[in-house]
């Protein structure tokens, strides 16, 4: 299992759920999830993207199941992934007609590791309870867990209207925003209670309550966490593109995780046109790793640069090493157990360079502006070499690779511990 640190505070106690062999809740490490954006009926494209997400570190992948062609493709996607040695659990994302698709395509129902149900659009009026029941009964039949995923963009309007009407009769009515938050929480809890009444075990239910506002997300999940002990999936829906989406998701989920709330997360980023879908996995890992909850890839500490570091050498070296470490992690996780705990320092001048490098497992202090063109390298806190000339970057990269082999390879120091 990927390394992780103990939470520095009590985590919320939740009921553990097995999702295709991945433990969610019950004290297990926070799980990183992702979702494809391919047409699921396009088997080649979907298999390729699931494989890429899994290689990037996604531990559960959700796929859209929106029509017969998609449902028919699911078992073939699962089979292809198995042949490739990719055992990542697949979650079926169902809206509107999930009850029909699961009934008409039993092979799909069996191939999926979990079903996502949206109580806001599982059915309407007199069909709602019946169609919700149909999906839950399919989950029971195939021994699958479900995520009851409430989203304020498709919130149960009957429930919201009733709560709004009740609120008007109060002496001190809540704001519309507060009522909406309460409707989201109630939708999740009432749906979970109904699923249990149908016969689904508590260890088969995960809840989520997604909104697009940071303060709304914090308020909704804080309330949900106090009123339910079901495992919780965190996500800020419609977070947006680029740095805006990253900052918003990290701000909201960071606060919740720090309070011990959250058993699995997804960073929902709007990708650039033809952008890399694995970016959301990387950001989720970096959030958990930065907060000290899990360790996925070696840390590269690098200074931000200042007037003493007019050269771009240290920036390029830090970027190259970080990219190389992440690229090799799918293989290194198996080949070098524990390598995710490695810390590398790439510093740009003499002010903090030697000290930061000594704190790392292996670090280099490159010369700043006007400094002697030499670069001391520190290994395990001690000066191990001084690099000179035009090949400093290449020489250090080789030293990092050699250090990993010596420390984490078979017969290495870490393997012997």
From Swiss-Prot:
Enzyme category, top tier: oxidoreductase
| Keywords assigned | 4Fe-4S, Iron, Iron-sulfur, Isoprene biosynthesis, Metal-binding, Oxidoreductase
Residue sites binding [4Fe-4S] cluster per the record: 303, 306, 349, 356
Q: How is the cofactor bound?
A: Binds 1 [4Fe-4S] cluster.
| Entry annotated with the keyword Cytoplasm | no
- Keyword 4Fe-4S, does the record have it? yes
Pathway per its UniProt entry is: Isoprenoid biosynthesis; isopentenyl diphosphate biosynthesis via DXP pathway; isopentenyl diphosphate from 1-deoxy-D-xylulose 5-phosphate: step 5/6
GO MF, one term, reads:
iron ion binding
Kindly list the cofactors needed. [4Fe-4S] cluster
Q: Which GO terms describe its biological process?
A: isopentenyl diphosphate biosynthetic process, methylerythritol 4-phosphate pathway; terpenoid biosynthetic process
The enzyme's E.C. designation: 1.17.7.3
Q: What reaction(s) does this enzyme catalyze?
A: (2E)-4-hydroxy-3-methylbut-2-enyl diphosphate + oxidized [flavodoxin] + H2O + 2 H(+) = 2-C-methyl-D-erythritol 2,4-cyclic diphosphate + reduced [flavodoxin]
State the protein's purpose: Converts 2C-methyl-D-erythritol 2,4-cyclodiphosphate (ME-2,4cPP) into 1-hydroxy-2-methyl-2-(E)-butenyl 4-diphosphate.
Q: Which family does it belong to?
A: Belongs to the IspG family.
Which PANTHER family does the UniProt entry name for this protein? Answer: 4-HYDROXY-3-METHYLBUT-2-EN-1-YL DIPHOSPHATE SYNTHASE, 4-HYDROXY-3-METHYLBUT-2-EN-1-YL DIPHOSPHATE SYNTHASE (FERREDOXIN), CHLOROPLASTIC
Q: What is this protein called?
A: 4-hydroxy-3-methylbut-2-en-1-yl diphosphate synthase (flavodoxin)
Q: Specify the species.
A: Mesorhizobium japonicum (strain LMG 29417 / CECT 9101 / MAFF 303099) (Mesorhizobium loti (strain MAFF 303099))
């Amino acid at each position: 299992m990927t390394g992780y640190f103990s939470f520095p505070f009590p985590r919320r106690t939740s009921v553990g759920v097995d999702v295709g062999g991945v433990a969610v809740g019950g004290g297990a490490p926070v799980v990183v999830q992702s979702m494809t954006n391919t047409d699921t009926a396009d088997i080649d494209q979907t298999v390729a993207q699931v494989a890429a997400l899994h290689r990037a570190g996604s531990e559960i992948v959700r796929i859209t199941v929106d029509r017969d062609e998609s449902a028919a493709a699911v078992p073939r996607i699962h089979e292809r992934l198995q042949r490739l040695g990719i055992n990542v659990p697949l979650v079926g994302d169902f809206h509107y007609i999930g009850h029909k698709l699961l009934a008409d395509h039993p092979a799909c129902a069996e191939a999926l590791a979990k079903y996502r149900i949206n109580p806001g659009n599982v059915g309407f009026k007199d069909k709602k309870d019946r169609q919700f029941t149909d999906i839950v009964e399919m989950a029971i039949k195939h021994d699958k867990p479900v995520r009851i995923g409430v989203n304020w963009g498709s919130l149960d309007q009957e429930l919201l209207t009733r709560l709004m009407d009740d609120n008007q009769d109060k002496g001190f009515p809540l704001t519309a925003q507060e009522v909406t938050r309460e409707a989201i929480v109630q939708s999740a809890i009432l749906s979970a209670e109904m699923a249990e009444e149908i016969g689904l075990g508590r260890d088969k239910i995960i809840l989520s309550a997604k909104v697009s506002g940071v303060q709304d997300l914090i308020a909704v999940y804080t309330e949900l966490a106090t009123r339910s002990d079901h495992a919780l999936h965190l996500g800020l829906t419609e977070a947006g593109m680029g740095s805006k989406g990253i900052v918003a998701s990290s701000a909201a989920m960071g606060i919740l995780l720090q309070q011990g709330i959250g058993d699995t997360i997804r960073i929902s980023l709007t990708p650039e046109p033809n952008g890399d879908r694995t970016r959301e996995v990387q950001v989720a890992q970096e959030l958990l790793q930065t907060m000290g909850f899990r360790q996925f890839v070696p840390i590269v500490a690098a200074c931000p640069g200042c007037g003493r570091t007019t050269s771009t050498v240290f920036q390029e070296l830090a970027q190259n090493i970080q990219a190389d470490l992440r690229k090799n992690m799918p293989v290194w996780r198996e080949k070098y157990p524990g390598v995710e705990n490695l810390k590398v320092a790439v510093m740009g001048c003499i002010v903090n360079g030697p000290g930061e490098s000594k704190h790392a497992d292996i670090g280099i202090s490159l010369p700043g502006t006007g400094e002697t063109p030499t670069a001391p390298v520190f290994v395990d806190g001690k000066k191990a070499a001084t690099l000179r000339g035009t090949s400093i970057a290449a020489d250090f990269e080789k030293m990092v690779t050699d250090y990993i082999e010596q420390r984490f390879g078979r017969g290495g120091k870490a393997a012997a511990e």
